[in-house]
């Protein structure tokens, strides 16, 4: 599966849980949340645009860092 890395403005465990919730709802993803560095690495066949739109549902500032 392709890996994608995103920067997400997460400040606490609650922020990380919000990211987990939207990604689990999307389905077809495996992900790792790096809260101290505010990064989310996602393994998924979904497009980076789909993943970005999904992460934007958290209300946090999100940017696509590129393939990993």
Curated annotation (Swiss-Prot):
Matching Pfam families, A to Z? HMA
Entries under Gene3D superfamilies matching the protein: 3.30.70.100
Q: Which PROSITE patterns match?
A: HMA_1, HMA_2
Q: Does the keyword Transport apply?
A: yes
Q: Which residues carry this modification: Phosphoserine?
A: 47
Q: Which residues carry this modification: N6-acetyllysine?
A: 60
The record's annotation in InterPro entries points to:
Copper_transport_ATOX1-like, Heavy-metal-associated_CS, HMA_dom, HMA_dom_sf
Q: Where is the HMA domain?
A: 1-63
Q: Which residues bind Cu cation?
A: 12, 15
Q: What GO molecular function terms would the record report?
A: ATPase binding; copper chaperone activity; copper-dependent protein binding; cuprous ion binding
Alphabetically sorted, this entry's keywords are: Acetylation, Chaperone, Copper, Copper transport, Ion transport, Metal-binding, Phosphoprotein, Transport
Q: Which residues form a coiled coil?
A: none
Transport as UniProt keyword: yes
* Entry text on domains: The heavy-metal-associated domain (HMA) coordinates a Cu(+) ion via the cysteine residues within the CXXC motif. The transfer of Cu(+) ion from ATOX1 to ATP7A involves the formation of a three-coordinate Cu(+)-bridged heterodimer where the metal is shared between the two metal binding sites of ATOX1 and ATP7A. The Cu(+) ion appears to switch between two coordination modes, forming two links with one protein and one with the other. Cisplatin, a chemotherapeutic drug, can bind the CXXC motif and hinder the release of Cu(+) ion.
Summarize the subunit comment.
Answer: Homodimer. Interacts with ATP7B. Interacts with ATP7A. Interacts (via dimer form) with SLC31A1 (via C-terminal domain); this interaction improves ATOX1 stability and controls intracellular Cu(I) levels.
What family does the database annotate? Belongs to the ATX1 family.
- Mind telling me what this protein is named? Copper transport protein ATOX1
Q: Which organism is it from?
A: Mus musculus
Q: What is the lineage of its organism?
A: Eukaryota, Metazoa, Chordata, Craniata, Vertebrata
The gene that this protein is the product of is: Atox1
